[in-house]
Amino acid sequence: MPPSNSTFDTCFHIHMVSDSTGETLMEVMRASVAQFEGTTPLEHLYALVRSSKQLDRVLDEVEAYPGVIMYTIVNADLRRELETRCVELGVPAIAILDPMLATLSAYLGRPVASRAGAQRSLDADYYRRIDALNYAMAHDDGQGDDFEGADIVLLGVSRTSKTPTSVYLAHRGFRAANIPLVKDVPIPEAVFSLRNPLVVGLTASPERIVQIRRNRLLSLNEDRDTNYIDDFAVREEILFAKRLYAKHKWPTIDVTRRSIEETAAKIINLLMEKRNMTV
């Protein structure tokens, strides 16, 4: 039974069943639920469900806590079993990849790939993201020196979201290094001769940077009488960075009013454009 309308937040159970890690399901579910104000999903994630026995345990949980089921299961027999049981339980089931797969199949004139190939692809994607995350951690804040192995190299003065953006890009499978820009301190010479990676300069408004830096110093209980948060000094830092970006024709992104996700999306678009130009 669907939840009733109320002046309070509507809580409901949502079950995500995947034969892989379930990350795709989680992202789609949260993006979808965000479109409905006043709702709070009670999330149940079941990953690596690849047998009837595993599915039985999932459905026992669904029976105990009825709600919407979202799934990405490619095994035809397991799908039929899940769909049949959902009808019996009277709960809606959504195969989130079906519309995309059906459209691609019709457009390409080819059937959907077999189980094993699809799973290998999913596994490869998982390990690619793990590798990217390890790379981001080893090349955070100017560490490391093998920048040619990166997909993306981010530059920026302190507090321009370099590290969180690098980590988010890593979760998307892109190897990202980030290098801090400090006025009158040279950056690694290797950056100027990079051929494979996309080099991107991050910037933000002086007011935004000063605000973030002040909050950081306050949280660390450190001295706030410093050039680190001096308006004029910060403006000089930003100007130095912008001149560097312009000199080397590196694309620049102002992160002042962008979320990490929006910044990363812009960077990925720039990377795809660069790769398309070199094909």
Swiss-Prot record:
UniProt GO MF annotations: ADP binding; ATP binding; phosphotransferase activity, phosphate group as acceptor; protein serine/threonine kinase activity
This protein's record includes keyword Transferase: yes
Catalysed reactions, semicolon-separated: N(tele)-phospho-L-histidyl/L-threonyl-[pyruvate, phosphate dikinase] + ADP = N(tele)-phospho-L-histidyl/O-phospho-L-threonyl-[pyruvate, phosphate dikinase] + AMP + H(+); N(tele)-phospho-L-histidyl/O-phospho-L-threonyl-[pyruvate, phosphate dikinase] + phosphate + H(+) = N(tele)-phospho-L-histidyl/L-threonyl-[pyruvate, phosphate dikinase] + diphosphate
Key words, A-Z: Kinase, Nucleotide-binding, Serine/threonine-protein kinase, Transferase
Keyword Cell cycle: no
Highest taxon listed in the record's lineage: Bacteria
Chain residues that bind ADP: 156-163
Family according to the record: Belongs to the pyruvate, phosphate/water dikinase regulatory protein family. PDRP subfamily.
HAMAP family documented for this protein: PDRP
Protein name, per record: Putative pyruvate, phosphate dikinase regulatory protein
Species annotation: Maricaulis maris (strain MCS10)
